[in-house]
Design a protein with these regions (language model features):
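Cationic, low-complexity basic patches in intrinsically disordered or flexible, solvent-exposed regions
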Residues: 10
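Domain-level signature for soluble enzymes in the chorismate/prephenate branch of the shikimate pathway
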Residues: 2-3, 16-274
Length: 274
């Protein structure tokens, strides 16, 4: 059994005998799957938005921080959870070989400002993010050596405050729009890679109880289904703010390889410090 220090089990790699879920949960109730409502999840959800999958599953879409809370409260059974939330669960299981990661620049998780890093005095934190905010704090203190004031936000108005020495962390699809407006753009995944030499994992599929090996196999297949249709999925979005074909194929990494899991483990280690 593979386990890290935060009581997180990598279920898709455990022996089959370790997955003993009550049959009634699988057979009598739909499994509620919470996913992020950003463009980068479209390829993962491609294989879940069909009649066969939806006969036994219900999809719940929201932004990252809400999905984590929904999992804690039992509103969903499985969630695409921000990596920074993993230590907050008493016990959790990573139940898929797929997630949201970046090997180099991610393009959609950036610090935007009108001045260079060393001149930033205030940073407004995107209210939709947990992992990205945690990553920003690690970069600030461990690598950049800056200590601006950090301000929590509650609505979309925070982006209007990017002026003078005030910057903002913006994630998701809105980051593509902000890239056209701001003078300085610091890609957090690229910065992480530059300092650690590792990919960064933003989100993983998590459950709070073991899932059966049969379900995990089915769920992995659903995640994998869209990987052969990235161009078609990109074109179907009719999105003009960023080249989604490039985004899906070169910026976002969906498979949780060993190297990407090493990046996740390194991030979780630093979370304990910061």
């Amino acid at each position: 059994m593979r386990r890290n220090r935060s009581n997180i089990e990598f279920s898709s790699r455990l022996p089959k005998k370790s997955f003993l879920c009550p049959a009634k949960v699988i057979e009598l109730e739909k499994i509620k799957v919470g996913a992020v409502s950003y463009l980068n999840t479209k390829p993962l959800l491609y294989g879940m938005q069909n009649e066969q999958f939806l006969q036994t599953h219900e999809l719940v879409l929201d932004y990252p921080a809400h999905i984590g809370e929904a999992l804690k409260q039992g509103i969903v059974d499985v969630g695409l959870v921000p990596a920074a939330l993993l230590p907050s669960f008493e016990q959790s299981f990573i139940v898929s070989d797929y997630g949201i990661a970046a090997d180099f620049d991610v393009a959609s998780v950036c610090l935007f400002s009108e001045v260079p890093l060393e001149k930033i005095e205030t940073i407004y934190l995107d209210y939709q993010s947990r992992s990205s905010a945690a990553l920003l704090k690690i970069l600030m203190r461990e690598f950049w050596g800056i200590q601006p004031a950090l301000v929590e936000t509650k609505d979309e108005g925070f982006r209007t405050k990017i002026t003078g020495t005030a910057a903002a962390l913006v994630i998701g699809d809105r980051a593509f729009e902000q890239r056209r407006l701001s003078t300085y753009v610091y890609d957090l995944a690229a910065e992480w890679r530059g300092f650690t030499g590792l990919p960064f994992v933003f989100a993983v599929w998590v459950s709070l109880k073991p899932m059966s090996p049969e379900w995990i196999e089915q769920f992995n297949a659903a995640n994998a289904a869209g990987m052969d249709y990235l161009e078609e999925i990109a074109e179907a979005q009719k999105y003009s703010a960023f080249n989604l074909r490039t985004y899906f194929q070169h910026h976002i990494a969906y498979r949780l390889t060993e190297e990407r899991l090493k990046g996740l483990e390194r991030f979780l280690e630093l979370l304990k410090v910061y």
